[in-house]
Amino acid sequence: CIEPLRSPAFTAADIVRGIREGGGQSFTICVEMHGRFNVATAIRVADAMRPYDPLFIEEPVPATDVGAMREVQLATTLAVATGERLRSTAEYGPYLEQRACRILQPDVGHMGGITGLKRLAHMADSHYVTVAPHCCWGPVQAMATAHVSSTIPNLLIQEDNHWRTGVFEETVVGGYTFDPQYIDVPEV
């Protein structure tokens, strides 16, 4: 018996549907696509997921292809997010100028630190684009990102990986409060 090949759009939508039905509307879903699709498939996947209300789809096509990202963003009502691997405001410029996404995900470690991330956030704000900083490398990066996030008007969310172990508590003076709803920004 040969079974029909399932479309990636339906497989992805089934996963997101299961998450939404299992948890209801009490939390936000962000879908990481990691540049796995071509434009046509990315649009089909976005359309199939739309009923389950994800906050955004992240890098539905390879992040290095601004034109492809723009095509997807223009074809869907879902917000497209990108940028965690970009390393300068110059690299982000085409995404903003071509309106290729609605959300930027800069990484403070790639952007030249706090000043670079803050500069990019202001640049994005001038294009009506929100920022959801990427943050996955450890306690120093988490605190630097939290400090920038607390000062930018176009912050959407801040990524945070709470997989950490005691290293966070040992590194951050005064501890580190993690709650899915907020981050305490310590004074140093």
Label for each model-derived stretch:
Residues 1-76:
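Metal-dependent enolase-superfamily TIM-barrel catalytic cores that perform enediolate-based chemistry
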Residues 47, 53-56, 64-182:
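Shared catalytic-loop signature of beta/alpha-barrel
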Residues 183-188:
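Short, intrinsically disordered, charge-balanced linker/junction segments flanking boundaries
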